[in-house]
Swiss-Prot record:
The keyword Ribonucleoprotein belongs to this UniProt entry's keyword annotation: yes
Chain segments carrying region Disordered: 31-51
Molecular-function GO terms, alphabetical: mRNA binding; structural constituent of ribosome
One Gene Ontology term from the biological process aspect of the record: translation
One Pfam family recorded for the sequence: Ribosomal_L34e
Protein name: Large ribosomal subunit protein eL34z
Family stated for the protein in its record: Belongs to the eukaryotic ribosomal protein eL34 family.
InterPro entries: Ribosomal_eL34, Ribosomal_eL34_C_sf, Ribosomal_eL34_CS
Amino acid sequence: MVQRLVYRSRHSYATKSNQHRIVKTPGGKLVYQTTKKRASGPKCPVTGKRIQGIPHLRPSEYKRSRLSRNRRTVNRAYGGVLSGSAVRERIIRAFLVEEQKIVKKVLKLQKAKEKVAPKA
């Protein structure tokens, strides 16, 4: 006769967080083993792309004790948070804003010189 299986924990509903698989133990018994959810990995909040170079783990497994720092991040500004293209875009935007400020300042000085020159 077939061995009956009983859930060992949680509730009996077939939800995503309560998935099981049947495993045969060394003693020959069949038991339910809880399966973990598949990890999708960290995403960039700006572009929505997956961040390269970081393993796909469940959120609790990124903790200090389970994963060393060099495996949690990428070695660049905003490493492990933003994707490379988002960081590049941000750097270029910041540079252009600073350039615009300088241009404004120069134009203001030129205008001031023009106002002073005709009077003399």
